[in-house]
C-alpha cells in the first residue's frame, strides 16, 4: 500500500468511522500532491440501522470501483463481509461545477466466524443455552458478593452497560460501546469560550449567534448582532456551496474558512487574510451549527503577518505545537538547502580543481618524462639512470643571430613558436623525448628514459621530419624557408633529475657533447651523422652518403655522414599525415599502409598520427 497501510488502519475503529475520515486523509495528502483530485465520502445511517454511502466526484465513471475497494477494506481491516448496491446516481451542480453523486447501500453479511461456529445439532444448541444460563448465574453471584448496592448506589442503567460489555448475546461477544452523558453541563459560558477561543455558532440561515472574542479581534464585523456568516467568510474546503444543507451533507469533513478581504477594515487591506480550520458540529436541540476551529497557520512568519501571537491560541490547541515544530522543520530544511548549495559549490570547485590538476600534469609531463614526473608527485626520489645506448639529436637555425638582429623580438618569438609546435608534434609521431630547447637549439633523445632497441631509426625519422617542417616556416628577414643544421650521435649517457624548485631531466656524458659537435659542424639543411649513428642506421632502409673525414673540435678527425632520406617511406608518412583516398564509388576510406616502411616508429599518442600505428617493427 505504498507505506500508507498503517495510516489507513488507524482511520477508524469500524467501517463507518473509517469512511467518515477518508476526506480528512485526502486533505492531508493534498498538501503533498497538490494536483490530486480526490473524491468525497459521506456516511449516513438510516433509522432502521442501514448504512448509506454518499460518493461525490468530479470524474464520472469511477463510482464502480468504490464497492470493490470498500468491500476489501471491510474484510481486511475489520474482518466483516459487506455487499454494496447502487441506490441512486445523479449529477449535482456545485460551486466548482458538476459532481457525480452516487448513493450506495452497505449491507453486512453474517459474520465469518459465526458461520464457522454455527451449531450443527440440537444438543449443541441446548449446551450453549446451559452455558449462557450458568454465566448469567455466575454474574449475579459476583454482583452480590463484591458490590454492595446500598453502600455504593449505582443506577440500574449502569448495570445494563456493564452487562452489555461482558455478556454474550446470541452466541457472540458484543463490541458496542454506550457512553454515559451528564444530566447537566458542568461548565460556565465564559470558561467554555476561554477553552475554545476560536469558535462560531450560527443557525440554519447562517446567522451568527455567538463568536469568540479572539475571532472578533481579527474579524471586527462579527461584533455586529445577527450578521450573515457567508458575508465575512468563504468556504475553501470542501468545495461546496455555503449553505446549511451543503455543510450538513459534509459534516464529517474538515472545513477551512477564509475571511473576505473586502469586508475587512481599510487599514487591514495589506494584511494576510485569516484562514480558520476546524470541525462543524450540528446541535439538533438548538437547531444550530457550531464551528470549532483554529487559525490555519504553519510558521511563525504567517503568525507575524496576521499580527497574531501564540498567546491568542489556546494552550490545548495543537496548532501551537504545529507552528513551533514546523518552524524547526523549516530551519532544518534551510540548513539542508545550505548544505546542498555548498555541496554543489564543492562539486564545481572539484571540477575546476580537476581541470587545473590536469593542466599541471600536462605541464609537468612536458618538463619531465611521465614515469619520472609520477615518482616526483608521489614524493619518491628519482635515481639516476645509466643508458648504454641511445641516440641524441641537436638542431639550430642557420644565421639565427643575424635574424635576431634584423627583426623585432615578437617576430622571433612567432617564428620559434611556429617551428617548435611542428617539432613537438613530430616527437609524438616518432615517440622520441624532447629534452629541452634553448633559444633556437632543439634537443631530442631516443632510447631515454625508456630503453628501446630502434632508437636510432626513430631519431633519424624525426630529423627528416624536422627538415620537411622547416620548409613551412618563413625567415622573416629573407622571406625564404628557415634552414636548419641537425646533428645526430649514438652512444651511452647518464640521465637524472636536476633541481628542486624547477626540476629538469638532464643528460650527461660524452655522447651529449659529440651530438652537439655534429650539429655545430654540420651544413644547412643537412642531417649530420657521427660514425656510431651511421653504424646504427646502416642497412635499415635509409639513404646515407659519406661526407668524409673532418676535424671535429675536441674530438680530432672523424669520418662523418649525411642522412638523405628514408627509402621505405613517403613524405606524408614521415610527417604522420593521414591519407584518405577516394575509392571508385566516391566513399572515403583509410589508406592501408605497409607495415615495413618507417623503421622504428611506434604508435603515436595523438589521434591524428594514428596512420603510423601500422609501422611498428
From Swiss-Prot:
Q: Where is the signal peptide?
A: none
- What name does UniProt use for this protein? Guanylate cyclase soluble subunit beta-2
**Mind listing the UniProt keywords for this protein, alphabetically?**
cGMP biosynthesis, Cytoplasm, GTP-binding, Heme, Iron, Lyase, Metal-binding, Nucleotide-binding
Q: Which residues form the Guanylate cyclase domain?
A: 391-519
Keyword Ribonucleoprotein tagged: no
Q: Where is the composition biased (Basic and acidic residues)?
A: 577-586
Summarize what activates or inhibits it: Activated by nitric oxide in the presence of magnesium or manganese ions.
Polar residues: bias regions: 588-604
| Protein family (similarity comment) | Belongs to the adenylyl cyclase class-4/guanylyl cyclase family.
List the InterPro entries: A/G_cyclase (IPR001054), A/G_cyclase_CS (IPR018297), H-NOX_domain_sf (IPR038158), Heme_NO-bd (IPR011644), HNOB_dom_associated (IPR011645), HNOB_dom_associated_sf (IPR042463), NO_sig/Golgi_transp_ligand-bd (IPR024096), Nucleotide_cyclase (IPR029787)
Further information: There are two types of guanylate cyclases: soluble forms and membrane-associated receptor forms.
- Subunit record text: Heterodimer of an alpha and a beta chain.
Q: What cofactor does this one take?
A: heme
